[in-house]
Structure formats: C-alpha cells, structure tokens
Amino acid sequence: MIAKSRVKVYRYDPDRDSTYRFDTFDVPVTEGMTVLDALNYIYENHDSSLAYRWNCRAGQCGSCTVVVNGKPAAACRSQMPRDGEVSIAPLLQFPVIKDLVVDLRPGISRLERTRPYIQRGKTPERPEKLLQGDIEPMKELRKCLECWGCISACPVVAEAWYEFSGPTMMTKLARLALDRRDIEERVKMAFTDGLYSCTTCKTCVEVCPKSIDIPGKAIEKLRVYAVKTGLGPLEGQMAFLNSIANTGKSVDRTSTPLLETVPERVEVPNPVDRVAFFTGCLMDYRLQNTGRSIINTLRRNAVEVLVPKNQSCCGSPAFRTGMTDLAEKQAERNVKIFESLGVDKVIVGCAGCGLTLRTNFEETMRRARGEGLRFKVYDFTEYL
C-alpha cells in the first residue's frame, strides 16, 4: 500500500483574496520523494493554479526555497515524510506575489547596493595569478546560492531589516573583503549595514543548503577587519572587553564568586571519571547556585571534579566583536591551565562558553602550535 502524506500549502492571491489560507492535499509518497515532487503532484493532479518557483531540481539554484514545517529549505532537497504532515509556506520578509512565489526585490535591491562583484583599480595583467592561499579564505563563502533562506530565518532581520542588511549581504561583503583583487571599502559597507547587529545565533547556518558558517566565516571575519580599521567594537561593547582585559571577567563582581566557595578538587570515593569544570563568568559571578548544582550532581554520580581557581573568561565577547588579540590571549591562558590538570574532559554549564571552547579555542591552538585541544569539551547535560 502506498503511503500518503497530508500537505498543507499556503495559498494567497492578492488580486482575489483578502487574506491567506492553507489548502490541504493528500499526496502519495514514494521512496526518495521531495517536497518539490509533492508540489508538482499537487499542481498536476489537484490544482493547476498553484504558483511556486523551481528550476534546477539539484539544489544548486536556490529558486525553490520555501518554508517547510517552519524552516526555510530547498523544496528539491527536502524529503517527504511517509504517513506524515507537511506544511509549506512562502519565505518570510518578502511580499507574496501569489501562493509560494515571493517578490525578491527587497533583498535584491539591498544586494545591488553592495555592488557584489570585484571592483578593480586597473585592468589586471593576463593571465591573472591567484594562489591557493588567496582563494581558501573565501572558498566557503562562494558557495552561497542566494536562496534567501537565511534572510527568511534571521531573527534580527525579522525585527530590524532596516538596520541589519542580513546574512546574504554579509556573506557577499566578506567574500569581497577577503579577495585581494577588490579595492572597494567592503568593511565600511558592512559596518554601515549593521555588521554588529548580528547576534551570531547561527540560525542562518541551520537553514543554509550549503551549511555556510556565516557568523564564523563572514560576520566575525568582517568584525576583525572593523577593529583593525578603527570602526569597531561598538562603544557599548567596550565595558565588557575592558573588564576582561583588566579583571579576567566580563562582568562585575556583585557577590562572593563561586570559585571562592568551592574546593579546587572535589573528591569522591572510587571515582568513575575525573573531569575539570570551566565555570565561565556568569557561573562564577552571577549563577553560583547553578554552578554548585553542577558540581554536586557530578559528585553524586561518582565523578571527581577539578575546579581550577585561576581560570578566567573564555573570551567569547572578544571573539564575537573582532578583538582577536584579547580573545586569543584568553584562550591560550585557559588552555594552559586546563591542560596542566591532566584531564581529557572539560565540563561547561554555559552554552556560549561551550561553543567558544569547542570552536575558537580549537582554532586558536591549531594556529598557535599546530595542534588542537588536548581535552574534549562537554556540555554538562551532554556529559551526563
């Protein structure tokens, strides 16, 4: 028996409808069937007035991108569930022309303003020489399909597109800023277009069909250049950065820190494991009870916990704002402290610290010594 899925499709024709609606269709699902296949089936067998875009059917053009079950995705690469329900809607932030077809001009006009092509000062000699080292930094950014899924998903764009031009534009600007052939002031363009408005939440990465790390490979790279040219960081960010530089913590002390109330070594009889605990600034200065609960839970599970008193801020605020000198100093300092403990696992209770240790610390140490971390980083719940 052929499985069937219920497909709810957004319908709206501004020439005829006062508001949108969802029409539901039963679609037989075969192995390997995609959302685009389902739309084609609906068009051919149920309603030929359904409007939607598609072209290559190979995940290379981005034209079929729609919102599938609440997340932007390429219809041609999204698998249909068997015996399930699928909701298909148009991309957010763009005016609907009809049904799933949106007017992309609000995004395209912003893209045009950035002049997303190489600006040269003179005609290059031919053949033009490009070394692998010149290409590598922008290689991932060149994969962008301009599908606009990241614009649809970005929470900052949803609230203030007038202030932040969005992930697509930042990807283009970063690619050109990293291209030695381009002479345009791309960093200044990015700064004017809200470079520091991005929260680096990585929602854009989750929906990107090419999995481009836009916050890491574009936004934060542009912020590094912004700092070097004197555009960044923003005035409001300096208090946290100065605090890290002066005290080793990103926030002020308001009560007795966690590190002053717990032993450096929490011993247990017959330990099943031995780990180190990275508190981070907030666990040490604001969420002391949470930190104590983590240590006590590990202890009750027969895990010996080392809590070095000389640990300091992971440097996340510095990494995120482009202050690489301060950020890498914090990374190297903390890595030295935790590697000296001889443990192979470091536990974190803060998601921001965990991300910084896993990604930024790893990258920093590889650049500094040609080798990554000698311990593995676990979120507390992940470790349990």
Model-derived segments and spans:
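A short, basic-hydrophobic beta/loop patch
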Residues: R82-V86
